[in-house]
């Protein structure tokens, strides 16, 4: 190791990702990524997860097999931090030989809205519903479904409680881009148009889901994936999504 590399290694704030607490973000993110991999949400290194804890943001790296991720692979940003340009983001801990997640500006967008955790998956069911909505309702329509019990697992909006059985769940859909970072403006626009939404679908790509904390983001992501799978099966049977 050359002197410059020794300096980086010595001053890399590794203590930020070292904890015996299973609820520590550096331990939670690899554990969540393993679960998501087993559920088929983050195959082929796709997807990502980020958690905000106080003035620190913990982010899964780019290009690491999600089922093999370890705490020492996690990036840490000082919060708040500039979203753009990428070179101005205040990383206070960088794993050697790994690249920051391409999802970073999208995660930061969720944190700007007060989220405590943001999850990005490549769920097949999420992709399929974006295609069905485009074919049936056009490219500008959002995903809508009502009268499904699992809708109760999705917030009505910040401080507004949860949706009810008779409510209509609406999830905006944005178009995919060639590069992940370029989705940011679309995500921001969708958040502005649907301020009560806790998720945004990306056509032919996947979904971003955020929550007030890690548990809420995870359970909301689970509920949505269940709903999307149900919606695909309902469509096969000719059943309407909204009564």
Swiss-Prot record:
One GO term of the biological process aspect: L-methionine salvage from methylthioadenosine
Region (Disordered): 1-22
Feature: compositional bias, Polar residues: 7-16
Keyword Chloroplast attributed: no
Catalytic site: 149 (proton donor/acceptor)
CC cofactor note: Binds 1 zinc ion per subunit.
Subcellular compartments: Cytoplasm
Residue numbers binding Zn(2+): 120, 122, 205
Domain of life: Eukaryota
MF GO annotations: methylthioribulose 1-phosphate dehydratase activity; zinc ion binding
CC cofactor: Zn(2+)
Assigned EC number: 4.2.1.109
SUPFAM superfamilies: AraD/HMP-PK domain-like
Keywords: Amino-acid biosynthesis, Cytoplasm, Lyase, Metal-binding, Methionine biosynthesis, Zinc
GO cellular component: cytoplasm
Pathway assigned in UniProt: Amino-acid biosynthesis; L-methionine biosynthesis via salvage pathway; L-methionine from S-methyl-5-thio-alpha-D-ribose 1-phosphate: step 2/6
Family that this chain belongs to: Belongs to the aldolase class II family. MtnB subfamily.
Annotated HAMAP family: Salvage_MtnB_euk (MF_03116)
Function per UniProt: Catalyzes the dehydration of methylthioribulose-1-phosphate (MTRu-1-P) into 2,3-diketo-5-methylthiopentyl-1-phosphate (DK-MTP-1-P).
Name of protein: Methylthioribulose-1-phosphate dehydratase
């Amino acid at each position: 190791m050359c002197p410059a590399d020794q300096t980086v290694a010595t001053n890399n704030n590794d203590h930020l990702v070292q904890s015996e607490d299973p609820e520590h973000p550096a331990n939670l993110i690899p554990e969540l990524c393993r679960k998501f991999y087993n559920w088929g949400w983050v195959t082929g290194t796709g997807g990502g997860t980020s958690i905000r804890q106080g003035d620190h943001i913990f982010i899964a790296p780019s290009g690491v097999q999600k089922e093999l991720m370890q705490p020492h692979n996690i990036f840490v940003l000082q919060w708040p931090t500039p979203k753009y340009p990428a070179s101005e983001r205040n990383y206070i801990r960088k794993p050697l030989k790994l690249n920051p997640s391409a999802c970073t500006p999208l995660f930061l967008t969720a944190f700007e809205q007060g989220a405590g955790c943001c999850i990005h998956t490549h769920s097949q069911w999420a992709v399929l519903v974006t295609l069905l909505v485009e074919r049936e309702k056009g490219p500008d329509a959002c995903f809508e479904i009502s009268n499904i019990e699992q809708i109760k697992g999705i917030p009505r909006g910040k401080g507004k409680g949860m949706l009810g059985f008779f409510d209509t769940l609406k999830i905006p859909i944005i178009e995919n881009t060639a590069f992940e970072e370029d989705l940011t403006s679309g995500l921001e626009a969708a958040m502005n148009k649907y301020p009560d939404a806790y998720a945004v679908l990306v056509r032919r790509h996947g979904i971003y889901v955020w929550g007030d904390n890690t548990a809420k983001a995870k359970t909301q992501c689970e509920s949505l994936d269940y709903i999307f799978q149900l919606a695909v099966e309902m469509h096969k049977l000719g059943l309407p999504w909204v009564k």
